[in-house]
Amino acid sequence: MSGQPKRLMVMAGGTGGHVFPGLAVAHHLMAQGWQVRWLGTADRMEADLVPKHGIDIDFIRISGLRGKGVKALLAAPLRIFNAWRQARAIMKRFKPDVVLGMGGYVSGPGGLAAWSLGIPVVLHEQNGIAGLTNQWLAKIATTVMQAFPGAFPNAEVVGNPVRTDVLALPLPQERLAGRDGPIRVLVVGGSQGARVLNQTMPQVAARLGDTVTIWHQSGKGAQHTVEQAYAGVGQPQHKVTEFIDDMAAAYAWADVVVCRSGALTVSEIAAAGLPAIFVPFQHKDRQQYWNALPLENAGAAKIFEQPQFTVEAVADTLAGWSREALLTMAERARAVSIPDATERVASEVSRVART
């Protein structure tokens, strides 16, 4: 039996912030001979994405409870029980040596199922504030890791696993030294875009004129509107795209990024070594604010809460950053990144599987 490959079940779903770090760890362990399966839900992004990476996926039926009506909350215990039972049956068949919870609703019943079967549970919290599921699962987990300090008081800070093409970018001092001309501003609202960025940045461009050149990811369905907004203020030269398929190339092009501060975005920007203006999504947990704070504290970024993200404030900030200042900020961003996060998470999974 000792010669058989170890088996891992990754539990992650819902958003790229959960799924992509899970894929990074899965590929790292598969390269070492591990067998990996995935636990997810059939109606979220993991259903299409994970099989494209050559990983088999099993589905359970579960969704979030926040913001649901009374009827849904009353039905929640039965739904969670059924999801737990489904996850338990899947794990009995696959017999994983360890399960890795990377977040999303699927981790709750999945983690409980593993624990009830005596399978070690390893958790990774991507955000600066722990989600409800991970807060609860941490009580039964064998190991808890966190990307940013503060989500859990005693958990090891290991960073977020980041795509290898971002990690492979030249260091800031190689990439940015010697650049001249307009400051290159990359505007990224995520795959869904961000209305506040789409509305504000064309006006910022009008104020800054030919001192900046902008590459603006508008999100689905917004490209024409944003192009019209730039043209309407006499700035039609800036590039607007719905999506950016090659984010590593976009980071390599940029001098500074203006974006939301989802956990994976913040970690990628740090790994790339880029200054940033972060506009946290407004949420009662202020999760994105806490994600961005370590980079602001390091002198690598500026946070604008959404009400403070005005044309004047952003234009003044960008105008006040010289190329020398941007290079210093880029080096600070890179210095606080944890480029071996994938290896750290994979190493802990391996350690737990051996014990």
From Swiss-Prot:
Its EC number is 2.4.1.227. Its main location: membrane. It catalyses: di-trans,octa-cis-undecaprenyl diphospho-N-acetyl-alpha-D-muramoyl-L-alanyl-D-glutamyl-meso-2,6-diaminopimeloyl-D-alanyl-D-alanine + UDP-N-acetyl-alpha-D-glucosamine = di-trans,octa-cis-undecaprenyl diphospho-[N-acetyl-alpha-D-glucosaminyl-(1->4)]-N-acetyl-alpha-D-muramoyl-L-alanyl-D-glutamyl-meso-2,6-diaminopimeloyl-D-alanyl-D-alanine + UDP + H(+). Signal peptide: none annotated. It comes from the Bacteria. The keyword Cell membrane applies. It is found in: Cell inner membrane. CDD domains: GT28_MurG. Keywords: Cell cycle, Cell division, Cell inner membrane, Cell membrane, Cell shape, Cell wall biogenesis/degradation, Glycosyltransferase, Membrane, Peptidoglycan synthesis, Transferase. The keyword tRNA processing does not apply. Transmembrane segments: none annotated. Pathway: Cell wall biogenesis; peptidoglycan biosynthesis. It is an enzyme of class 2 (transferase). UDP-N-acetyl-alpha-D-glucosamine binds at residues 15-17, 127, 163, 191, 244, 263-268, 288. It is a peripheral membrane protein. GO terms for cellular component: plasma membrane. One of its GO terms (molecular function) is UDP-N-acetyl-D-glucosamine:N-acetylmuramoyl-L-alanyl-D-glutamyl-meso-2,6-diaminopimelyl-D-alanyl-D-alanine-diphosphoundecaprenol 4-beta-N-acetylglucosaminlytransferase activity. One of its GO terms (biological process) is cell wall organization. Cell wall formation. Catalyzes the transfer of a GlcNAc subunit on undecaprenyl-pyrophosphoryl-MurNAc-pentapeptide (lipid intermediate I) to form undecaprenyl-pyrophosphoryl-MurNAc-(pentapeptide)GlcNAc (lipid intermediate II). Belongs to the glycosyltransferase 28 family. MurG subfamily. This is UDP-N-acetylglucosamine--N-acetylmuramyl-(pentapeptide) pyrophosphoryl-undecaprenol N-acetylglucosamine transferase. It comes from Salmonella choleraesuis (strain SC-B67). The lineage of its organism: Bacteria, Pseudomonadati, Pseudomonadota, Gammaproteobacteria, Enterobacterales.
